[in-house]
Amino acid sequence: MRLHHLLLALLFLVLSAGSGFTQGVRNSQSCRRNKGICVPIRCPGSMRQIGTCLGAQVKCCRRK
């Protein structure tokens, strides 16, 4: 029974770490690797923000 609890905790840790993977985009190279483009100010309506490029003003956007 203790093994089940350990495996459940490990599974939770792995799944929670992978869920926000694209939110770590912080430069133009990682933006392109995540199939995004760098756009100044705001993402267009057909795209969503997945991170930033070169600072907070330039957004990394990807199609919805």
Swiss-Prot record:
Subcellular location: Secreted
Tissues where this protein is expressed: In many of the exposed epithelial surfaces including conjunctivae, bronchi, colon, urinary tract and trachea.
First and last residue of the signal peptide: 1-24
S-S pairs: C31-C60, C38-C53, C43-C61
Keyword flag Disulfide bond: yes
Keywords: Antibiotic, Antimicrobial, Defensin, Disulfide bond, Fungicide, Secreted, Signal
Gene Ontology MF terms in the entry: CCR6 chemokine receptor binding; chemoattractant activity
PANTHER family the record matches: BETA-DEFENSIN (PTHR20515), DEFENSIN BETA 4A (PTHR20515:SF2)
Annotated protein name in UniProt: Lingual antimicrobial peptide
Name of encoding gene: LAP
